[in-house]
Structure formats: C-alpha cells, structure tokens
C-alpha cells in the first residue's frame, strides 16, 4: 500500500466480536492521513445507547473470561502476540497512514506491542496471593481478583501500542476492556480487536468504541465501568479524574511532560548527541516523555550544540511509508500551527533558532498538503521562556547551559511535570546521585526514550499516577481480597 491510497471502508466500532456501526451517535469526527492531508474516514461518535451495549457485551465476556485459569488466559494472549508478529507490516502500515510516524518507527511500535502481550501472558499464569499463619492453627490468605470492565482511553501518538499496553495487563488479570481511541487515530485499535477475537478471546472481551469528549464522558460515568486508564493531556486527565471520582473508580493517568535531559561535560559526546535526538525527534517530537529541556554543561555546550545541529539537519523528512524516511508529518494542521507558534514565541522572547522550525513541503506533489515541519533547535534559552516551561509536543529542542550539579538539579525539577528525565555522564556515582534527586517517574542514565515492557512507566506530579508495563501494573488492574479462616471456636465478648 502506498501513501495517498487508503480509505476506511468498514465500521470503526467493534462489539461482540465484529465491526459494527453505532446504534446511536453523539456527533461525527473525521480522520485524516497526515502525510497528505487527505480525509480517510468520517465516522459517528458513539452515543449513550452504543456505550451501554458495549458495556453489557463486555460484562458478559467478563463472566466467562474471569473464570478461566491463568494458563488459559496466557494461551490466548500468546496467540494474539503471535498474530501481531505475523501481521507486523500490515499493522505498521496502518499506523503510519493514520498517525504519520515513519514506517521504521511504526514497526518498532508493533514489536513492543507483541512483547507486551507476551510479558503479561507470563504473568497471567503466575498470579497468586499469599498465605499467612495465625495463632491457634487459624490462617488467612489473599486473592488477587479482577476488577470487571475496564476502560482504556488512548492517545494519537502511539495508537496501537497504547491499546496493547492497556489491554494486555487488564486481560491478564481476568478483566474485560472497552477501548476508546483518539478520534484522530481510530483505525489500528480495530486490528487489535480482531486479533484478540481470532486468538480465542470471548466475544466482547475487547470492544472498541469510537468518539470524542461526549463518548468519553458516557464511558467514564457508566456505573458498570470499574476502572479508567487514560493517556493524554493534563486538562483532559483532570476532567477524567473528576468524572471517575464521582463513581469512586480507580484510575491510571499518563499525562504530559516537560522532561529535563542533563548532559555533563564528562559524557560520551557521541552517545549524548544520539540521546538528545532520541529525546526530541521520535514521532516528530510528539512523545509525552520527551527530554525537550536539554541542559548542557558550559564546557561542552558549543561542541555539543554544533554536533546536534549537524545531525538534526540530516534527518530525512518525507513520505513516512518510505524506508529511508526518519521524520514524517505532525498529526494535523491545527497541531502543526500550534507547534510553529511556539517557535515564533521563542524567537520573540529572545531564543535563537539554529535550525528548522519552519513549515516543510516535500518534493513529492502528493505530499504538498501534508503537515510537515523541519526539526528545530533553539539556543539562548532561559528557564522562564514559554518554550522551556510548556509542553510543545513537536520537534523542538531547547538547549540551556549550566555550571554545577546542584544548580542543574534545582532547575530540572522546577516544573509541574514529572514524567521522565535523563542524564549523560561517565561518573557512575554522579549518575545514580542525580537520578535519585530528579523528580520524575522514569530516569534514563546514558540513554533516552527506551521502553522495555519489563519496566514500569508513569509519572510524578501533574504527569499522572499509576503505572503501565512491569509487574507492578498487575496491581492497578486487580483488587486484593483477604480471607480470614478460623480453625477453632469463636471467642466473643458477648
């Protein structure tokens, strides 16, 4: 399949093991191909009746799934992972068409997706409580039990991967899931739903409900939704938290960031430059944990900046389905204009643009209406500038200089966000000392933006709470029951 040829021809809701049109609507949305600006779908946003049907369907599947053994759930997840591997290129192409990231990156996203399913398949078969001996031969034990119907709300930057990150632990624990993709990227979650069905999951175990804010509200406030896991912006996360609070629902929030990347003078310069590029330009800079505040020790600032600019200018921008493309378009026209606005604001506030920050028109005429820009490096930045304080969510790196470790730690932590942070240094004591002081949920030492499924991922402060990936996520998709067993006579005060 080539850029500019795909059009959605099937329903985008998935309920009861099949694609369906919603029985009612709360408006419509359009989905676009970012590379060309071409509309690929107009779809109905699910109304309250459709949400109710999806929840009832998921409840029925939950009754079946929650009674299966961990080994039986493991087998379904492993089969789903196998199918994802088998359909790797197909899924990656769909992701690239609807999201705009390069096919090179999209394939890596698919790989981390099947790895996630395999990891939680292993945990599904090993979930257990504990036995506690009590006086007189009595004892207690704990059971880790599923919550019920869980709601996953995805973001548009990693549509398929996020659907896997949320559904794999939920299903491993014995839950059912309803997944609402971002209306910007409605396509690839349907592929995952079909894969779960083909792998042997009960019909309704993973339903996909399309829609915007109104659909999300129907889902969050539904009495039979037991848990909400959301990836997205801080303002939307606050609204979801308010809605979930009214139903006393547990939630996981993975929100925005303005992460610091600290480059000490004793670093391996080659690796530090690579790390800075990874921290800023993956998925066109549209990554919540990006290290967009790059603090460079003064002794190496000039050399580091020169090399970062040189390598940034070499990044191949263009058709995201071509193998040599490393940067595709941003998600849509309003977001492109927003990011370009941050660059204009930075210049007005005194920052210097060393490269990029401009709209880009690829040579291929079919891409002329795509949402492209050149990756941008800003220098002469100060901590009070808008480009340094606010999440841009685009390919814009702000370089700042520092002199001492104590100084940079204070500045790095001076933010309401706390999703990630990074440090490059050859001093292993300093590396661990700095990581301990950084106020962030994930700290990278001598690397950046790696996400092994074995490691928990989540934020501090306004970047959210709860975790995705790692063994600990089982605790966020289950509840603990304590059983107390008396082996003797009851001693009573009455």
Swiss-Prot record:
Detected in lever (at protein level). PROSITE patterns: ALDEHYDE_DEHYDR_CYS, ALDEHYDE_DEHYDR_GLU. InterPro entries: Ald_DH/histidinol_DH, Ald_DH_C, Ald_DH_CS_CYS, Ald_DH_CS_GLU, Ald_DH_N, Aldehyde_DH_dom. Pfam families: Aldedh (PF00171). One of its GO terms (molecular function) is aminobutyraldehyde dehydrogenase (NAD+) activity. Keywords: Acetylation, Cytoplasm, NAD, Oxidoreductase. NAD(+) binds at residues 180, 232-236, 391. The modification N6-succinyllysine is found at residues 30, 59. The modification N6-acetyllysine is found at residues 30, 298. Pathway: Amine and polyamine biosynthesis; carnitine biosynthesis. Its main location: cytoplasm. It comes from the Eukaryota. The keyword Oxidoreductase applies. Its EC number is 1.2.1.47, 1.2.1.3, 1.2.1.46, 1.2.1.19. It catalyses: 4-(trimethylamino)butanal + NAD(+) + H2O = 4-(trimethylamino)butanoate + NADH + 2 H(+); an aldehyde + NAD(+) + H2O = a carboxylate + NADH + 2 H(+); 4-aminobutanal + NAD(+) + H2O = 4-aminobutanoate + NADH + 2 H(+); formaldehyde + NAD(+) + H2O = formate + NADH + 2 H(+). The active site is at 254 (proton acceptor), 288 (nucleophile). PANTHER family: ALDEHYDE DEHYDROGENASE-RELATED. Belongs to the aldehyde dehydrogenase family. Converts gamma-trimethylaminobutyraldehyde into gamma-butyrobetaine with high efficiency (in vitro). Can catalyze the irreversible oxidation of a broad range of aldehydes to the corresponding acids in an NAD-dependent reaction, but with low efficiency. Catalyzes the oxidation of aldehydes arising from biogenic amines and polyamines. This is 4-trimethylaminobutyraldehyde dehydrogenase. The gene is Aldh9a1.
């Amino acid at each position: 399949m080539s850029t500019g040829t795909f059009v959605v021809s099937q329903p985008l809701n998935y309920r009861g093991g099949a694609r369906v049109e919603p029985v009612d609507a709360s408006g419509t949305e359009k989905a676009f191909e970012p590379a060309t600006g071409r509309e690929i779908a107009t779809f109905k946003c699910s109304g309250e009746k459709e949400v109710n049907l999806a929840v009832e369907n998921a409840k029925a599947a939950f009754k079946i799934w929650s009674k299966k053994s961990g080994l039986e759930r493991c087998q379904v997840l492993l089969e789903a992972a196998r199918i994802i591997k088998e359909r790797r290129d197909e899924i990656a192409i769909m992701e690239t068409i609807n999201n705009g990231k390069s096919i090179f990156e999209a394939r890596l996203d698919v790989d981390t997706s099947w790895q996630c399913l395999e990891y939680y398949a292993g945990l599904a078969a090993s979930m257990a409580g504990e036995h506690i001996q009590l006086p007189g031969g009595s004892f207690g034990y704990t059971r880790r039990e599923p919550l019920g119907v869980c709601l996953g709300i995805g973001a548009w930057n990693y549509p398929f991967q996020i659907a896997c990150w949320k559904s794999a632990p939920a299903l491993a624990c014995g839950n059912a899931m309803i997944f609402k993709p971002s209306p910007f990227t409605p396509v690839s979650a349907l592929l995952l739903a079909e894969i779960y069905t083909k792998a042997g999951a009960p019909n309704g175990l993973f339903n996909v409900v399309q829609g915007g804010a109104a659909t999300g509200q129907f889902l969050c406030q539904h009495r039979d939704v037991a848990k909400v896991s959301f990836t997205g912006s801080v303002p939307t996360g606050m609204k979801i938290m308010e809605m979930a609070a009214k139903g006393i629902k547990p939630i996981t929030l993975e929100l925005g960031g303005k992460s610091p990347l600290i480059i000490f003078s004793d670093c391996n310069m080659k690796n530090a430059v690579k790390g800075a590029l990874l921290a800023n330009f993956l998925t066109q800079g549209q990554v919540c944990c990006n290290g967009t505040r790059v603090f460079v020790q003064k002794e190496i600032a000039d050399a580091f900046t020169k090399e970062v600019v040189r390598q940034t200018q070499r990044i191949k921008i263009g058709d995201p389905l071509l193998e040599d493309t490393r940067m595709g378009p941003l998600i849509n026209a309003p977001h492109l204009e927003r990011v370009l606005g941050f660059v204009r604001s930075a210049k007005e506030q005194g920052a210097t643009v060393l490269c990029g920050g401009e709209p880009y028109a690829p040579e291929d005429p079919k891409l002329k209406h795509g949402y492209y820009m050149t990756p941008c490096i800003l220098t002469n930045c100060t901590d009070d500038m808008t480009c340094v304080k606010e999440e841009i969510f685009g390919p814009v790196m702000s370089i700042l200089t520092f002199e001492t470790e104590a100084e940079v730690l204070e500045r790095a932590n001076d933010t309401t966000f706390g999703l990630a942070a990074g440090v490059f240094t050859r001093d292993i004591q300093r590396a661990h000392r700095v990581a301990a002081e950084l106020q962030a949920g994930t700290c990278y030492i001598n690397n950046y933006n790696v996400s092994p499924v074995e490691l928990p991922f989540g934020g501090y402060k306004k970047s959210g709470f709860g975790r995705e990936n790692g063994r600990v996520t089982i605790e966020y998709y289950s509840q603990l029951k304590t059983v107390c067993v008396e082996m003797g006579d009851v001693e009573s005060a009455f």
